[in-house]
Amino acid sequence: MKLYHSLSEAIAAFQRKSREVLAIISFNGQAYFVFRSNPNAQISTIMQAHAKMAIGNELRHCDTKKVDVVRKQKLYNFMMNSGVSQQFPQNAQHAEENLIRNFPNILKKFKAEFPNQKINTIEIFLTHSPCSSKGKKKYSAQCHINNFFLPPGCDKKLAAFFKKENYKSIDKQLFDKKVKLRIHYNHQFDPSIEYNNHFIREADPILKTVLCDGLDSRVKH
């Protein structure tokens, strides 16, 4: 898990894939960590099969977008039978969940980089607003992450973990008594859910420009 020293540095290090969600967390505006969403094992395997076929086309000086569907399916079946799918997480994981899952690790990174410094500000930047069990789109029902029991929907997970300060239990001495916390999102994932509060809110125009220029303009299809 790499530590970046600015938002622009963190954004520049990643090329977002199509339909991929990124979550960037900042401690004190000094340390930034990036987390990606990932599909389930089967989808990850077929995506890798597609990528291999595209590379093969490129080496033969053929159109990388015109992948032979039959050959790709045969390669996918071979990869599945060879156990390639076992290399990937079996279930789809949202970026917010991966952030919570790796929270203990990034605290260790922060302490190593900034010894004797307490965390007083946490900001999270999302490419898309969190999924919600109250919305019309699919949401994550995964409830157990790092021995924490968290409710369905990433909006409730973030609230339970951060707003209720359960994150402090991982290393109580590392945080100030009062920590400023804010979550910004760039795009609205589910139009049926509106976030307009001090905890989760749409990014302001300047921040949206930074996120769009850095992440949306370089989406890898």
Regions found by a protein language model. Give the residues of each.
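Zinc-dependent deaminase catalytic domain
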Residues: 1-221
